[in-house]
UniProtKB/Swiss-Prot annotation:
<feature type="region of interest" description="Leucine repeat II (LRII)">
    <location>
        <begin position="478"/>
        <end position="510"/>
    </location>
</feature>
<keyword id="KW-0805">Transcription regulation</keyword>
<feature type="domain" description="GRAS">
    <location>
        <begin position="309"/>
        <end position="692"/>
    </location>
</feature>
<keyword id="KW-0804">Transcription</keyword>
<feature type="region of interest" description="Leucine repeat I (LRI)">
    <location>
        <begin position="316"/>
        <end position="376"/>
    </location>
</feature>
<feature type="short sequence motif" description="VHIID">
    <location>
        <begin position="428"/>
        <end position="432"/>
    </location>
</feature>
<feature type="region of interest" description="PFYRE">
    <location>
        <begin position="519"/>
        <end position="613"/>
    </location>
</feature>
<comment type="subunit">
    <text>Interacts with SNRNP35.</text>
</comment>
<comment type="similarity">
    <text>Belongs to the GRAS family.</text>
</comment>
<feature type="region of interest" description="Disordered">
    <location>
        <begin position="289"/>
        <end position="313"/>
    </location>
</feature>
<dbReference type="InterPro" id="IPR005202">
    <property type="entry name" value="TF_GRAS"/>
</dbReference>
<comment type="function">
    <text>Probable transcription factor involved in plant development.</text>
</comment>
<keyword id="KW-0539">Nucleus</keyword>
<feature type="region of interest" description="VHIID">
    <location>
        <begin position="395"/>
        <end position="462"/>
    </location>
</feature>
<dbReference type="GO" id="GO:0003700">
    <property type="term" value="F:DNA-binding transcription factor activity"/>
</dbReference>
<feature type="region of interest" description="SAW">
    <location>
        <begin position="616"/>
        <end position="692"/>
    </location>
</feature>
<dbReference type="GO" id="GO:0006355">
    <property type="term" value="P:regulation of DNA-templated transcription"/>
</dbReference>
Length: 694
């Protein structure tokens, strides 16, 4: 889409395992020595125990609410990552200078220091300056920023944001035919002229439309047909125009702040009005989870079960047609590919069932690959001006029906708190590769506020890729400002270090490590965007792992997307990514209605963009490169890390949480090779594990 999540006080307090240190673990397998990881010295009181699901949602909803209430949120950059932004900026700059873009660029970053007084102000107007030292309740706040000192711009020929894919039964033999027969060659060659001035003019027109008087002519029908009717190209244009019109404001301007406040109050009051949340340990669950091993060994490519939302109708096997089309595209058989795309278009829609939506986005990607414009389309999708508030709402919908990210965050935060408590840490330094909007950390901040004894200082080093424009670190700095405000509410001493540059170019001194602090390195599903040895002589993945090994962290917790669609061969990769996203679209179709606008936005901004990159891009432009959890396990061991076995009680409680809050027959939680695995209907999607340096 990057980059959403939710969580808090005592959100993990119920993970109190008196038998943790007895050394008995799962499946009678030989285990690693974990003598260096003692049980918690500071068990949390029973009266603070609460349901992890409710507290996690409460904290993150509060954090998202705080983000949405900011006055200029609509104009702020979206932090859901665009892995090609830096590369596109560098290429355009080198081309403007008449030089060749180097494969391995290692520019030195610029280091600047910004006082938190410029970023965080109290309601009364006072600020917390980095040079001020106060009491423990108003401890020193500091803010550092490390960003890439390099101007940025668009690709010289970007695809317009309103670009519409079309497939017709009759196509010209030239590559431009992919846009439809009505496009001439000159028009296609000059269609990428949407300048900043034009964008500002469009924005001004949209703002002016807010003040137009209401009339029947302005009323539109938001319903979208589920089936194709009439000519495909006309239907697609009407669908796009309807979508664009529906985004315009009503004639009478209404401040969204009140609406958002009411929406979040209804959610938060429900959580706070309850007298005492029932501890998950006291709730009644089955003695054993549904299955001992929930991940089936079904053959690759087996179709997911039909979802409850699907309706009966005779349609061709879209997956088979997509694979056949991919084979035709791979050998440049344009005639066959065009015919198959035309047939697929007749039975696909972004508003249909899971299979139809899947086919819609894969057809777009195959069409872009056939035209040779995959990178431009992906860049345009990544650069689309979608407001952060809309993205957050879509993400909130996702985490409300899918436990993947919630479970990964609970697992990581609980592990950090347990080990930090065992070490009696006074300062916790979290180095987060891919911090995005920082949704993972409010729950941990809330936990720190409930911690016994003296207050613990929190340091966070937020690492992100640079954004386009003259302020490449603006997004990651904004994340630090929000986290600082959250720490201020709970009187947690806080220090933030922002880094916006290529991850493989980060040096040890950039992280500003200090003696005696508890260092935890974390990454939530973002290592998949690092290039590997197939496209770079020095693998950025191994380089980042070696950097983490040099840090000598007290704990390293990678959360990975476990996938096998990183093969260099197109058809093989296409099959794997098709099976992977078949599960994800089926999951959305089972848990959300087709008309849900947030579902449509999430699938378009995240799934659709990722599919476009995997299918239509190659070389360094293909940044969606997941590996299986066993491949990441081998990489970590080669880099000098030792894996820590999972807590049996923790895995059991997470299973029960998913089974009680979600559909137990579809969402899977299990473990293998000391990895906590999550999946859908037997297919592994995400994995998390704990490592320490040798």
């Amino acid at each position: 889409m990057g980059s959403y999540s939710a969580g808090f006080p005592g959100s993990l307090d119920w993970f109190d395992f008196p038998g943790l240190g007895n050394g008995s673990y799962l499946n009678d397998q030989p285990l690693l020595d974990i003598g260096s990881v003692p049980p918690p010295l500071d068990p949390y009181p029973q009266q603070n125990l609460a349901s992890a699901d409710a507290d996690f949602s409460d904290s993150v909803l509060k954090y998202i609410s705080q983000v949405l209430m900011e006055e200029d949120m609509e104009d702020k950059p979206c932090m859901f990552h665009d892995a090609l932004s830096l590369q596109a900026a560098e290429k355009s700059l080198y081309e403007a200078l008449g030089e060749k873009y180097p494969v391995d660029d290692s520019d030195q970053p610029l280091t600047t220091t910004t006082s938190l007084a410029q970023l965080v102000s109290s309601p009364g107007g006072s600020s917390y300056a980095s040079s001020t030292t106060t009491t423990s309740s108003d401890s020193q706040w500091s803010f550092d920023c490390l960003e890439n000192n390099r101007p940025s711009s668009w690709l010289q020929t970007p695809i317009p944001s309103n670009f519409i894919f079309q497939s017709t039964s009759t196509r010209a033999s030239s590559g431009n035919a992919v846009f439809g027969s009505s496009f001439s060659g000159d028009l296609v060659s000059n269609m990428f002229n949407d300048t900043d001035l034009a964008l500002q003019f469009k924005k001004g027109m949209e703002e002016a439309s807010k003040f137009l008087p209401k009339s029947s002519q302005l009323v539109i029908d938001n319903s979208v047909p589920n089936r194709l009717t009439g000519k495909k190209s006309h239907w697609r244009e009407e669908e796009h125009l309807t979508e664009e019109r529906s985004k315009k404001q009503s004639a009478i301007y209404v401040d969204e702040t009140d609406e958002l406040t009411d929406m979040f109050d209804n959610i938060l009051i429900f959580g706070e009005a309850k007298e005492q949340p029932v501890c998950i340990l006291n709730e009644s669950f089955p003695k054993e989870p549904a299955k001992a091993s929930t991940f089936s060994k079904s053959p690759k490519g087996e179709k997911p079960e039909a979802s409850g939302n699907s309706y009966t109708k005779e349609t061709p096997d879209l997956r088979t047609m997509l694979v056949s089309c991919a084979q035709a595209v791979s050998i440049n058989d344009r005639r066959t590919a065009d015919e198959l795309l035309s047939r697929i278009r007749q039975h696909s829609s972004s508003y249909g069932d899971g299979t139809e939506r899947l086919a819609h986005y894969f057809a777009n990607s195959l069409e872009a690959r056939l035209a040779g414009i995959g990178t431009q389309v992906y860049t345009a999708l990544s650069s689309k001006k979608t407001s952060t508030s809309d993205m957050l709402k879509a993400y909130q919908t996702y985490i409300s029906v899918c436990p993947f990210k919630k479970i990964a965050i609970i697992f990581a935060n609980h592990s950090i708190m347990r080990l930090a408590s065992s070490a009696n840490a006074k300062t916790i330094h979290i180095i987060d590769f891919g911090i995005s909007d920082g949704f993972q950390w409010p729950s941990l901040i809330h936990r720190l506020a409930w911690r016994r004894g003296s207050s613990c200082k929190l340091r966070i080093t937020g690492i992100e890729l640079p954004q386009r424009g003259f302020r490449p670190a603006e997004g990651v700095i904004e994340t630090g400002r929000r986290l600082a405000k959250y720490c201020q509410k709970f009187n947690i001493p806080f220090e933030y270090n922002a880094i916006a540059q290529k991850w493989e170019s980060i040096k040890l001194e950039d992280l500003k490590l200090k003696e005696g602090e508890f260092v935890a390195v974390n990454s939530l599903f973002r290592f998949r965007n690092l290039l590997d040895e197939t496209v770079a002589v020095h693998s950025p993945r191994d380089t980042v792992l070696k950097l983490i090994r040099k840090i000598k962290p007290d704990v390293f917790i990678p959360g990975i997307l476990s996938g096998s669609y990183n093969a260099p061969f197109f058809v093989t990769r296409f099959r794997e990514v098709l099976f992977h996203y078949s599960s994800l679209f089926d999951m959305c179709d089972t848990n959300l209605t087709r008309e849900d606008p947030m579902r449509v936005m999430f699938e378009k901004e995240f799934y659709g963009r990722e599919i476009m990159n995997v299918v239509a891009c190659e070389g360094t432009e293909r940044v969606e490169r997941p590996e299986s959890y066993k491949q990441w396990q081998a990489r970590a061991m080669r880099a000098g890390f030792r894996q820590i076995p999972l807590e049996k009680e923790l895995v059991q409680k997470l299973k029960l949480m998913v089974e009680s809050g979600y559909k137990p027959k579809e969402f899977d939680v299990d473990q293998d090779c000391h990895w906590l695995l999550q999946g859908w209907k037997g297919r592994i999607v995400y994995g998390s594990s704990i490592w320490v340096p040798l």
